[in-house]
Design a protein with these regions (language model features):
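A generic short alpha-helical patch detector that favors 3-5-residue windows
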Residues: 30, 103-107, 130
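Amphipathic alpha-helices that form helix-helix packing interfaces
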Residues: 35-38, 42, 75, 94, ...
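Acidic, low-complexity proline/glycine-rich segments
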Residues: 1-10, 99, 105
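Membrane-interface, cytosolic juxtamembrane amphipathic helix immediately N-terminal to a transmembrane helix
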Residues: 118-161
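Conserved phosphate/pyrophosphate-binding and hydrolysis machinery centered on Walker-type P-loop NTPases
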Residues: 28, 81, 124, 128
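Glycine- and small-hydrophobic-enriched helix-loop-helix hairpins
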Residues: 50-122
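Juxtamembrane/interface alpha-helical elements of multi-pass membrane proteins
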Residues: 6-78
Length: 161
């Protein structure tokens, strides 16, 4: 009796683990799309409204989902305070602190941090080119992952059972 109950618990837990892993994969794609949206919003603020970077971040924060809104607000606040820290370091620190509970992989966060290195110190034209490049990279990654979804979802759910 106890063995049957234990076996049922193990099967249930492994099934739920597979479903959870599948959901996390889908959530990662959604969050990469949100990063894409963030870059487009910042690009619009900088190129068309001629906003300073902290202002562009703050303005974009109101238009994005949690936890990216707080990431942008915190980054803008710290950039405004300008305590002698380079913007790229500040950006990377906020990624580590504000985006640690997301479905984004370490690689996704590192690429986003590299994008942050191109903000703030380059002229507007170079920032525009850096944003275009990062958007293209994101687009390619999202396309690849969307093609992988059916296979990965099936794999995770099968492994769970």
């Amino acid at each position: 009796m106890l063995r049957v109950a234990g076996a049922c618990l193990i099967l249930s837990a492994s099934s739920l683990l597979g479903v959870q892993k599948s959901r996390q994969f889908t959530k990662r794609i959604e969050q990469l799309q949100e990063l894409q949206r963030i870059v487009l919003l910042i690009q619009g603020e900088i190129l068309y409204k001629n906003a300073a970077l902290p202002e562009a971040l703050r303005s974009s924060a109101g238009k994005v989902k949690v936890p990216f809104d707080s990431f942008l607000r915190q980054t803008a606040g710290r950039a405004d305070a300008f305590d002698g820290v380079r913007f790229s370091d500040l950006f990377e620190t906020e990624i580590k602190e504000q985006l640690k509970g997301t479905a984004l992989t370490k690689e996704d966060k590192e690429e986003f941090a590299r994008f942050g290195e191109s903000l703030g110190y380059l002229d507007v034209e170079m920032q525009k080119n850096a944003m275009k490049l990062y958007l293209k990279e994101l687009e390619q990654k999202i396309e690849y992952l969307q093609k992988e979804i059916p296979q990965k979802r099936k794999l995770y759910q099968s492994l769970g059972v």
